[in-house]
From Swiss-Prot:
GO molecular function, one term: argininosuccinate synthase activity
Family classification: Belongs to the argininosuccinate synthase family. Type 1 subfamily.
SUPFAM superfamilies: Adenine nucleotide alpha hydrolases-like (SSF52402), Argininosuccinate synthetase, C-terminal domain (SSF69864)
Annotated compartments: Cytoplasm
Gene Ontology CC terms: cytoplasm
Annotated residues for binding of L-citrulline: Y84, N120, R124, S171, S180, E253, Y265
Highest taxon of the lineage: Archaea
Gene source species: Saccharolobus solfataricus (strain ATCC 35092 / DSM 1617 / JCM 11322 / P2) (Sulfolobus solfataricus)
Alphabetic keyword roster: Amino-acid biosynthesis, Arginine biosynthesis, ATP-binding, Cytoplasm, Ligase, Nucleotide-binding
TM helices/strands, residue ranges: none
UniProt-recorded name of the protein: Argininosuccinate synthase
Length: 391
């Protein structure tokens, strides 16, 4: 039997290699997908072999993640419950896709992952695999063995397995779009998140900085006039915005699996780019377009968070987003300082904004007759309803 395991190099999946091998008497093939995490992939490969893998794949998917996933998170202002930029959720279907590709290539009977029965990731991974490879068996060791973190460490030591324990306190998941932090006192929502939990958003600079971001068809293409590939641009802004202490998200999140959790993320580039994109949309879209766009933004964010990347509606929303973002080209100027972020200017050739019309100091004014007629018609529904109801 061959089992292909989605392998991060962390504690859960490292222990899974030996457990799967011994439990199923199987050959274990590990797959690590590079989606922008700052890991030593050579060491991860070595750890996989020592733990018992017969073959290991390291797959570079950074550009694909940026161009096919992050680009749409920007075009569709992907913020789950208005705050979380979907950093972890967004990467899962791509990782699953690469694992399935290896499983098909190797003729594996099963694929495995390290998600627990409490997490959203089990839903995302399982549904992605079912969509891409319906006949393959899915194994989630952590859903079967119910070992605690301490149990896993003990098991690894007993088996002589080298493990990477990211921190005595925290469990970290990281990719190009963000960093999530769990563990220690974070699960108590009444307590402040300790400063030592953060890595990307430690404030280095005390002076404010103005940053110009250029967009073309809804996707950022340049920073301060310098053209960049999207993955490089995101990486650059993670450092730029994070060094000013900006990009922390802490909130109570409604999980897919039926309960609320306290979640903490570092997402400096993600938040900054989405905020800038939203501002350009407000500058360019008509009121009706803007209302419609906000509706599909929320719908898309919910689909991605809930593990429904392969839902047909998500593909339709991408087509709508491509069409609507044809007009979202221009420049947003942002100020970042001391953990804060604000838009300080914007311009676009597609903006209907007219200073001549909008200014109170000069230019066009409607006549008194025009204003009175507009107000009368605008309020007619409400005024007549009040009259007939005797209000």
């Amino acid at each position: 039997m061959k089992i292909v395991l989605a392998y991060s190099g962390g504690l859960d999946t490292t222990v899974s290699i030996r457990w799967l091998k011994e439990t199923f008497k199987a050959e274990i093939i590990t797959v690590t997908v590079d989606v922008g995490q700052k890991d030593d992939f050579k060491k991860i490969e070595e750890r996989a072999y020592i733990a018992g893998a017969s073959k290991h794949y390291t797959i570079d998917a950074v550009r694909q993640f940026a161009n096919n996933y992050i680009a749409y998170a920007i075009k569709l202002n992907g913020l789950y419950e208005g705050v979380y930029p979907l950093s972890t959720a967004l990467a899962r279907p791509l990782i699953a896709e690469k694992v399935v590709e290896v499983a098909k290539k190797e003729g594996a009977e099963a694929v495995a992952h390290g998600s627990t029965s409490k997490g959203n990731d089990q839903v995302r991974f399982d549904l992605a695999v079912k969509a891409l490879y319906p006949d393959v068996k899915i194994i989630a060791p952590a859903r079967i063995w119910n070992m605690t973190r301490e149990d896993e460490i003990k098991y690894a030591k007993e088996k002589g397995i080298p493990i990477k324990v990211e921190s005595d306190k925290y469990s970290i998941d990281e990719n190009l779009w963000g960093r999530s932090i769990e563990g220690d006192i974070i699960s108590d929502p009444s307590l402040e998140v300790p400063e030592d939990a953060f890595e990307w958003t430690k404030q280095i600079y005390n002076k404010k900085e103005i940053v110009s971001i250029e967009f073309s068809n809804g996707v950022p293409t340049a920073v301060n006039g310098e053209k960049m590939e999207l993955n490089k641009l995101v990486d650059f802004l993670n450092l730029k915005f994070g060094s000013h202490g900006f990009g922390r998200v802490e909130h109570i999140e409604n999980r897919v699996v039926g309960f609320k959790s306290r979640e903490v993320y570092e997402v400096p580039a993600a938040l900054g780019l989405i905020y800038a994109h939203i501002d350009l949309e407000k500058t360019i879209y008509t009121p009706m377009e803007l209302r419609f766009k906000r509706h599909i933004d929320q719908l898309w964010s919910d689909l991605v968070y809930q593990g429904l990347w392969f839902e047909p509606l998500r593909e339709t929303l991408h087509k709508v987003a491509d069409e609507m973002n044809k007009w979202i080209s221009g420049e947003a100027k942002v100020e970042v300082s001391n953990g804060s972020f604000r838009i300080v200017g914007r311009e676009s050739e597609y903006s209907p904004y007219s200073e001549k019309i909008a200014s109170y100091n000069k230019g066009w004014y409607p006549s008194d007759e025009m204003a009175r007629g507009f107000i009368e018609i605008w309020g007619m529904h409400s005024l007549i309803a009040r009259r007939v109801r005797g209000l």
